[in-house]
Amino acid sequence: KSSENSEIKAIIPESNKTTGNIGVEYLIFKYRLNIYEEHFFPIKHNLLGLKGSKINEIKNVYSHAQALSQSSNFIRKYNLNENVRADTAGSAKYISENKDKTKSAIASLLSAEIYNLEVLQKNIQDDENNVTRFLLMGKDIYQPEFNKGDFLTSFLFKLKSKPAALYSALSGFALNGVNLTKLQSFPEKNSFSSFFFLCDI
């Protein structure tokens, strides 16, 4: 919707301190979204189950792929079967409706409150200081006031797959002392002969 309506903005998770890139490059390319701001939020994961359930009863855990990956140590410790769902809140809702005490969800404390679930264990993420970078994105192009501070610039470019193509494209940044904080590649649709690159400088 944010690609069609200027009044609607999207907040998208871009990368995580523990698991790395989450993957928003296709959104920027497919929907021609512009990045306005970045925000870093601490992420706390919690194991939720039905009221009265116990951790030693749990056999299956449901959540978003990122939440599962960021809680892998806990999952291995309790030998839980992972089940990937679209999002964490939806996983909590599924547990509340399923009525099976062997199933659990990794989600927020707010989800536990909304869906009347038991918090079986708080802060199960691998990294105590787990942080995710979010991007505020939208349709319109906004020109920042460059005299009011430092800014990060994100941009896309495309190269054919041939020797030294990437080196030639990026050497100018090195020669001029420009620091690249992100460089990510993904293939052009239906082709591996050319690639798009997403950069932050």
Labelled PLM ranges:
Residues 1-201:
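Domain-level signature for soluble enzymes in the chorismate/prephenate branch of the shikimate pathway
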